[in-house]
Amino acid sequence: MKKIIYMQIFVTVTTLVGLSAIKKSTDTVDQMTYDWSRTFAEVLQLTNQKHYKPAVIDEAMMNAMDAFLNTLDQHSNFLKPKVYQRMMESTTGEFCGIGIVIDNTRKEKDQHLTIIDTVPGGPAEKEGIEPMDKIVEIDSKALGGISTDEITTWLKGPRGTTVTVKVMRKDKPDLLTFTLTRDVIKEQNSLSFYLKDQNIYYLALSTFSQNAVNQVEALLKQATKNKYRGVILDLRNNSGGLLNAVVDIAGMFVTKGSVIVTTKDKEGRVTNRYPTTRNPILADMPIFILINNYTASAAEILAGVLKIHAQRGSTKNLHAFLIGTKTFGKGSVQEVIPVSNNCAIKLTTSLYFLPDDTTIQGIGIEPDFVVERTMPLSEQMRWFTQNYGREETFKNHIKVHITPESTPKKPLTEGADQAAKRWSERAKELLQQDNQLRAAITLINLLGTARQCCPAQVTTREKTVQFMREHLITNDTPLTIEQVP
């Protein structure tokens, strides 16, 4: 019986490792790979025979295969049956979890999982978890060395069950513990608004799905009916999604048949080209794209493609500009390939290349206008500014008695129930304090003014960027400072 187990292990490991080896000939297996796979099988057999504790072969094999795939790159990993099943379930857009948006750019070696946002009305928000909190433990299990895919399965589960997380929060010396009851979470992939006073349309995409395609198309068709001044496309914190959705959305801006992205294998051979198949919708109006360090993968492709086509002038009347900070730099393609025992592997098989034959892998996309995000004051800083640094904070300050106008007092509970707010209501509040959004609005207004008063300054994209940089002070604008004699 042990010989049969040994041979099964040997054949499985040899096949897995053999598929990963770089070989010019497909008829033979690299001798070194063969030798080491044989050694691996021997170790398993000896462990099973001689170790004091009974070996759990299935768990050991899955961990070993995951460790092997992790040595290739941080995005390749082994999907255990439960992880693979939950991954397939989550594609429906509805699942039972705690209601958080996570940092998908996390590395497996990281000891924490950053929460980018919470779902309004979800379990996490109800219990007081905040954006940018960092989860360090889930049900007493540390996160270091665990893939993000597996961590998400720990957070998901049947409705009504509980999960306990320990959270590290900025300015808090101790870890915070939350016990959350899982509930149905309906993900919100997009939000759109109309800025009436500025006559600007705003659209935020958190991921790329077919629903996102429909939302972008509906907004652009509505915008083209009006004499709008510009569109702001918010790709901040967008970690990617469906590539065909990106191609469809790009097709709304660029000439039909334009190649959006190509993929190349490890030999540099082009494996796929993805051209647009539709006619563009956007009229002769600027589009400003907000990006940050959490803009990754498919979101980077869309930002990069629109920038390149605008620079080339290959699409008439495409005026695309990037605002914010450098993107994440994930330009690799992963395939989820089912294997036996209800498992799968997520394997990096190729790299994305933009229309100018450059890759974003490890490089990212640079914005045209660097604008760092300034966050609203923390609770501690709000208290500090209210209690210090003003005349009224002195104990014996002179008071001027002014009879205030009589105004009805608002109920104390008004606006306190944050959990009841919808996505759009909370987004409106956040956008009011968003300096990057305000920079985009300023640039749209600046471009509109330039087209009227000095159109010669904005005839090309290069000239337009130069003109706007001269008139907008951003984080990367050098200041010439001279001493007054």
Task: List each model region and its residues.
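C-terminal "post-core" interaction segments
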Residues: K3-Q8, S20, Y34, L191-P485
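Bacterial Sec-dependent signal peptides at the C-terminal "C-region" and cleavage site
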Residues: L16-D30
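Acidic/histidine-rich, surface-exposed loop or edge segments in extracytoplasmic proteins
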Residues: S25-T28, A41-K50, N199, A416-E425
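Interdomain regulatory linker/hinge segments that flank or connect interaction modules
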Residues: R38-G93, P158, D171, A440
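Short flexible coil/turn linkers enriched for glycine and charged/polar residues
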Residues: T92-C96, R106-Q111, I129-E130, G157-T161, ...
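PDZ/PDZ-like domain segments forming the peptide/carboxylate-binding groove
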Residues: G93-E137, K141-G144, Q210, S350
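PDZ-domain C-terminal substructure recognizer with occasional recognition of PDZ-binding tails
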Residues: T114, V136, E150-L191, T348
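PDZ domains, with a preference for the canonical peptide-binding region formed by the helix
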Residues: P131-K166, A245, K330-V333
